[in-house]
Amino acid sequence: MKQALTPEQIKEQKPYLDWSLSEREYDYISEKLLGRLPNFTETGLFSAMWSEHCSYKKSKPVLRLFPNQNDRVLQGPGEGAGVVDIDDGQAVVFKAESHNHPSTVEPYQGAATGVGGILRDIFSMGARPIASLDSLHFGELDDPKMQMKVAGTVKGIGDYGNCMGIPTVAGETTFDPCYSGNLLVNAMSVGLMDQKDIQKGKAAGIGNAVMYVGAKTGRDGIHGATFASADFSDENATQRSAVQVGDPFMEKLLLEACLELIQNHPDWLVGIQDMGAAGIVSSSAEMASEGDAGMDLDLDLVPQREPNMSAYEIMLSESQERMLLCVNKGHEDDVKKIFDFYGLEAVTIGRITEGRQYVLHHDGQVVCDIPVSSLTDDVLEETSEEQKPARILQAEQEANWQPEVTDAGATLEQLLQQSTIADKSIFFEQYDSMVRTSTVVGPGSDAGVLRVRGTKKGLAMTTDGNGRFVYLNPEVGGKMALAEAAANIVATGALPLAITDCLNYGDPNDPEIFWELHQSVSGMAEACRVFDTPVISGNVSLYNENNGQAIHPTPMVGMVGLIKDLKNLVKMAAQAAGDQVYLLGQTGDDYAGSELQKMLTGDIAGTVADFDLNHVHAMMKTLLSLMEDGKVASAHDLAEGGLGVALAETLFKTDLGMNLKLDLTKNQLFSETAGRFVVTVKKEDAAAFEAALGDDATLIGEVTNSHWLQVRLADGNLNKNVADLEQLWKEAIPCQLKSRD
């Protein structure tokens, strides 16, 4: 690394502007917080900790709209992950994180380290990770370069998760041109624990040890946090030094060592935190702040894998597979023995001090001496201008696009071959979904389901996000994202508990983009309150742009639900001939942002209609009650492609068919009205089912042995062999990928 600048040179040359620190912030730090010019190391620490990625300085005012508590929440936002009570002294722990910028630059390592980072967040809370999920958004598959990025991303996720022995059980993958220059790779992890083992990222107790454990520190990932707080351009998209490199075998050892310490020797440990974004500085400063303490660190003691690392590099490195512990004085050697057994570094690099000062030593010199609060609590929140986008104002003045479907069968065949709808097994078959043998329902269904061993309980989990609807109507799109996640959870027979999120947007300095963020979070927050699903963790990923072209605003909702007794688990596929088929919810002419619109016009446009959240929630509540009473044979929520696609998906992987009569048009068969399900019910349960749901349930036909989907519509018919439809659906993506060769 080049010679560090003096404080005076920093003031004059302003290198901090390239590190996402503004001149206003630099002056505030110098004049108000420190009363002097910060040195090179200190300036680097401020640039990382004051980045949007670490501080949420632009998004905090919006994030306050989210509810984050209810009777089940044991730990909300602010720790490594959220924790929710699932009864019997047990808790589920979950969180999602984005790794968009690194994955765009280096898809394999970016995706792999995204998985590794979120797993560390889970076991830092004291939980054993039991499942991984993802939410992946790519450009179109007809681009050979995008095919390579898709392959790298999927392999990175699969390799890391498989080596860790943690199943990937659910997720979503979409394709749209808006993600061509900036992929979205959102990783979610779910863990299980006894409530007595919950940990905090806290450093307290004067004289207690600060211990560094795990892999050695290198120069990879330096300024990863600030890299994630700026958009891409042709000039900076080559910042591969900001991408971390992962080692899942090291992480597996780290997981086992940490859980052994937490579960067997809780009296040795004060707090524990993952070294994620901004590396040592973030974990150490946040732990000291949480414990209302000071901290004194000797960076010469930090295990390093590269020679001559500066204090700046050591503190800002985002090398993977590292944790920071606060250990009660006198137990340092005890802790070291545990990590020695696993072949891991475990070094005391500092102590907790009186007061709230953050002091770093390197090469015999003090290289940082600043208040802890200046890094964590004194960040200047920023207010952003908001402006309703011109495209939305114009769309509100125009009539919505209406399709003209002439052949419902041919249209269904085409839709099933669209990349976002088509079978994704070519991707998720690279993930081990059954390792640890707790998986009950794996990828390809509405939600993944795992059993809670030693109990009758199950956990359902899903990730959902549709940027197209949010792009056209951010507030309604935000509601739809939450309602879609809830529908996926309820479709399995589970009660939605809480959510995590990844808020993926463009440059917040653009008034239109900040308006999108504000409006969509407002819609999500309203839906969270209606469904009683607080936001317990998550992250914000802004600046998802390439050369000024922003992605569609894409909030991702990760939701977990509880199945009280797995005997009441409901599958997506139709179960038996003779079962009655019901459409739940009312169907409108909702084509704006739909797969049908994109397929037929090559674009999306129009306005997305609002819907009654309270009514949808009440309907789901009734449906869940019927499931718990054993009155539902199968259930599938309606999403991309509407009822037509959902009916086909319900019959795939079965030998069954359906004979249906609908008061819907050929167009409406593919409408994407929110809050609907297709449900099958045994004949003997039909009367009770109809009585409970009333007008929300429309009998549309029955399941047959024919393996044909036969639908009589108000203006035509659809008759298709299910095996033929399934073959088109299964072969669509492999055919696109082969076209590259």
From Swiss-Prot:
Q: What class of enzyme is it?
A: ligase
The UniProt record gives the binding positions of Mg(2+) 2 as: D121, D274
Q: Which positions are annotated as binding ATP?
A: Y56, K95, D501, G538
Can you supply one Gene Ontology CC term for this chain's record?
cytoplasm
Pathway-wise, it operates in:
Purine metabolism; IMP biosynthesis via de novo pathway; 5-amino-1-(5-phospho-D-ribosyl)imidazole from N(2)-formyl-N(1)-(5-phospho-D-ribosyl)glycinamide: step 1/2
**Reaction catalysis annotation:** N(2)-formyl-N(1)-(5-phospho-beta-D-ribosyl)glycinamide + L-glutamine + ATP + H2O = 2-formamido-N(1)-(5-O-phospho-beta-D-ribosyl)acetamidine + L-glutamate + ADP + phosphate + H(+)
Q: Which residues are substrate-binding?
A: S98, H99, N100, H101, R120, Q244, E318, S319, Q320, S541
Please give the biological process terms from Gene Ontology that the record holds: 'de novo' IMP biosynthetic process
Keywords recorded for this protein, A-Z: ATP-binding, Cytoplasm, Ligase, Magnesium, Metal-binding, Nucleotide-binding, Purine biosynthesis
* Alphabetized GO MF terms: ATP binding; magnesium ion binding; phosphoribosylformylglycinamidine synthase activity
User: Which Pfam families does its entry note?
Assistant: AIRS, AIRS_C, FGAR-AT_linker
In short, the EC number is 6.3.5.3
ATP-binding recorded as keyword: yes
What is its quaternary makeup? Monomer. Part of the FGAM synthase complex composed of 1 PurL, 1 PurQ and 2 PurS subunits.
Question: What does the UniProt function comment say about this protein?
Answer: Part of the phosphoribosylformylglycinamidine synthase complex involved in the purines biosynthetic pathway. Catalyzes the ATP-dependent conversion of formylglycinamide ribonucleotide (FGAR) and glutamine to yield formylglycinamidine ribonucleotide (FGAM) and glutamate. The FGAM synthase complex is composed of three subunits. PurQ produces an ammonia molecule by converting glutamine to glutamate. PurL transfers the ammonia molecule to FGAR to form FGAM in an ATP-dependent manner.
Tell me the protein's name.
Phosphoribosylformylglycinamidine synthase subunit PurL
What is the organism field in this record? Limosilactobacillus fermentum (strain NBRC 3956 / LMG 18251) (Lactobacillus fermentum)
Lineage here is: Bacteria, Bacillati, Bacillota, Bacilli, Lactobacillales
Whichever gene encodes this chain, its name is purL
